Amino acid sequence: MKQGIHPDYSATNARCSCGNTFIFQSTMTKDVNLDVCDKCHPFYTGKQRQASSGGRVDKFNKRFGALGSK
């Protein structure tokens, strides 16, 4: 490997909006602000909600479903 061409690799702080902080190795020199992390993301916390919004087919059937029953 050539000397002096690679960026510095050091510890960087990451801070989530929920208040959780952790340290990881990166070439970034500034702290990283995150929107979600593994402590507050719904997938990892088990607080997922099922989306029950109807799609285009349901919308079509609501509008025109009664016409086909004549």
Swiss-Prot record:
Keyword presence, Nucleotide-binding: no
An annotated GO cellular component: ribosome
Region Disordered, annotated ranges: 48-70
A biological-process GO annotation: translation
Cofactor field: Zn(2+)
Record-stated family: Belongs to the bacterial ribosomal protein bL31 family. Type A subfamily.
Protein's name in the database: Large ribosomal subunit protein bL31
Organism from which the protein derives: Photobacterium profundum (strain SS9)
Protein's gene: rpmE
